[in-house]
Amino acid sequence: MILSPARTRIKICGLTRPGDVDVAVAAGADAIGLVFYPRSPRHVSLALASDLARRLPPFVTPVGLFVNASPEDVERACEQIPNLLLQFHGDETPAQCEASGRPYLRAARMDPGFDLLNFARSYTSAQAILLDAHVEGYGGGGKVFDWSLIPSDVPRPVVLSGGLNPANVTDGVLRVRPWAVDVSSGVESAKGIKDAVLMRQFCEAVRDADARSIDASSGY
């Protein structure tokens, strides 16, 4: 892995309500995910996504999640949310991911037969590779995958996703040392409805992992 940050970035995905956005930001999220996949229970319209993105303070990034969307749909989202970071979660080719000229994340669906190194080398223009569980359909389904499948020399920054929650994210950060972590169902009371307590606990657990990592590297 090319980067092991002193502070692990946090993305909370699948936000649908203004109040949840405010709590996520206050808890310490560095990014919020807006789902543009119509089949997702966390799907938001472009109008709502724009409203949610406008609530964000400086240096908190809106991320738009797309699954095999048309170039026109991606372009409309970029026009409405000028600072949108793209996240492709379907079968998009490198050329399709690069078509808008915007920075993007590329999701990888992890299973024992998946060649992550070859996949990452195919998406050299990606800002990072987001690692999720391989389940039927798209998205990780709130499932944790085997973290031992992650090679130590992934040639892009890694975002760890897939079944993370306040109880396991500390271990995930310490074991994988990703650039960022991404959570959705692990901080929800219902699909698309975030739980304020769980969001705070998740962010605190990530910071605890960072502190432990610093202590370990310092010899304390």
Swiss-Prot record:
UniProt keyword Amino-acid biosynthesis, yes or no: yes
- Write the signal peptide boundaries: none
According to UniProt, this protein's pathway is: Amino-acid biosynthesis; L-tryptophan biosynthesis; L-tryptophan from chorismate: step 3/5
The Gene Ontology biological process annotation of the record reads: L-tryptophan biosynthetic process
Q: Which UniProt keywords apply?
A: Amino-acid biosynthesis, Aromatic amino acid biosynthesis, Isomerase, Tryptophan biosynthesis
Pfam families per UniProt: PRAI
Keyword Isomerase listed: yes
Entry-linked NCBIfam families: PRK01222.1-4 (NF002298), PRK01222.1-6 (NF002299)
Q: Which named protein is this?
A: N-(5'-phosphoribosyl)anthranilate isomerase
